[in-house]
A protein has these predicted regions:
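Short loop/turn motifs at secondary-structure junctions and domain boundaries
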Residues: 33-36, 86-88
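A short glycine-rich, His/Asp/Glu-containing loop-to-beta-strand
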Residues: 47-87, 93, 141-144, 149
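Short beta-strand segments in beta-sandwich/barrel cores
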Residues: 84-85, 102-106, 120, 151
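Short, conserved beta-strand element in jelly-roll/cupin
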Residues: 89-105
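Ligand-binding loop in jelly-roll beta-barrel domains
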Residues: 72, 110-112, 116-119, 125-152
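Signal peptide processing junction and immediate N-terminal pro/mature segment
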Residues: 22-32
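Bacterial N-terminal signal peptides
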Residues: 9-20
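N-terminal secretory signal peptides that target proteins for export/translocation
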Residues: 1-5
């Protein structure tokens, strides 16, 4: 069963990245090919008990890929347009990647993060006040959640 879950996680990850990169326009292809880093928005709980956001760079090895991270499963989610989830914490430490549609996360201080297709979030605010989420734009938001086996905050590929 674990073997099947791992395979599904890998297929989903590869599919998500291919979908993201395949959606690039011709003008963006050159930029995508010359990028040296993969960025993600880390949502974490600060010492004040509030959720905060920061942009992080995922560490890339000489093979142009991150080190392999163990996942415990994969979940695809469709969030209907207009859905709002009031203050909540992440259910576990996980990556969430927007595949289509748009969303928005709000953290402490009213800071809002726009979630466009291809946006990678590292959710680490599993305690404290949490964050809000909403589906915005013209269509449902489709995303993939990849729970990490290592639940140690701050250890994801950086």
């Amino acid at each position: 069963m674990r073997s099947i879950t791992r395979r599904l996680a890998m297929v989903a990850l590869v599919g998500a990245f291919l979908l993201i990169w395949g959606a690039e326009t011709d003008r963006d292809v050159v930029g995508a090919q010359t990028r040296k880093s993969i960025m993600a928005t880390r949502i974490y709980t600060g010492t004040d008990g509030q959720s905060h956001a920061e942009e992080i760079e995922l560490k890339i090895t000489s093979g142009n890929a991150s080190e392999m991270m163990k996942a415990t499963g994969v979940q695809f989610r469709r969030t209907p347009l207009g859905t709002f989830s009031d203050w909540h914490v992440g259910p576990r430490r996980q990556f969430v990647i927007t595949l289509s549609g748009r969303g928005e996360i709000e953290v402490a201080g009213g800071k809002k993060i726009s979630l466009e297709p291809g946006h990678i979030e590292l959710i680490e605010d599993t305690t404290g006040k949490g964050h809000t989420t909403r589906a915005v734009g013209k269509e449902d938001r489709v995303s993939i959640a990849i729970p990490l086996a290592d639940q140690t905050v701050g250890s994801a590929g950086r």
